[in-house]
């Protein structure tokens, strides 16, 4: 077996470092925002979920930003343990706007095992503001496309 030339190996390492440092695409940034919100629920940090909501956020039944925050805080009080499992995210970016649809499984409880669980189909609408995405519309339903 022939040794790999040092210059070639350094070149490959340099390319990997540059790729890791490159700016993320809008879709990557959107997916990262969704993941951060997921982690915010699981880590019981409501601010991580509420921060990316636009001031004019509108959810199911006319729920506004404050309504969603109250719902989240109520669930955190009800469930000591919460798990959020995202299905594949189908994202579509159109300039400064984006739509992301996915299935999410939510489970919660206070003991060793989850006592409650539900699967939702979620459709979200986002707009770019600076270098971040703000969620301005969300619809969710039980197992059916919203």
Which residue stretches match the model-derived regions?
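Sec-dependent bacterial lipoprotein signal peptides
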Residues: 1-19
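Short, low-complexity N-terminal intrinsically disordered segments enriched in polar/charged residues
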Residues: 20-52
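Solvent-exposed, acidic/flexible segments
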Residues: 23-30, 42, 61-65, 115-119
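Hydrophobic pocket/interface hotspot
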Residues: 37, 45, 49-50, 57, ...
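Short solvent-exposed beta->alpha transition segments
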Residues: 50-87, 93
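Solvent-exposed loop/turn segments at secondary-structure junctions
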Residues: 56-58, 106-107, 142-143
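Surface-exposed, charged secondary-structure patches
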Residues: 74-116
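Short beta-strand edge/turn micro-motifs at domain boundaries
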Residues: 99, 116-146
């Amino acid at each position: 077996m022939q040794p790999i030339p040092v210059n070639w190996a350094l070149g490959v390492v340099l390319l990997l470092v540059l790729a890791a440092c490159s700016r993320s695409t809008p879709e990557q940034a959107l997916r990262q925002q969704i993941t951060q919100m997921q982690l915010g629920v699981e880590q019981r940090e409501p601010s991580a979920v509420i921060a990316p909501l636009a001031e004019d956020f509108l959810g199911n039944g006319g729920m506004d930003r404050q309504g969603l925050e109250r719902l989240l805080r109520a669930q955190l009080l009800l469930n000591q343990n919460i798990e959020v499992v995202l299905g594949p995210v189908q994202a579509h970016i159109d300039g400064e706007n984006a739509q992301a649809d996915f299935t999410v499984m939510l489970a919660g409880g206070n003991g060793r095992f989850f006592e409650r669980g539900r699967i939702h189909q979620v459709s979200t609408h986002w707009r770019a503001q600076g270098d971040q995405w703000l969620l301005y519309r969300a619809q969710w339903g039980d197992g059916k496309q919203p």
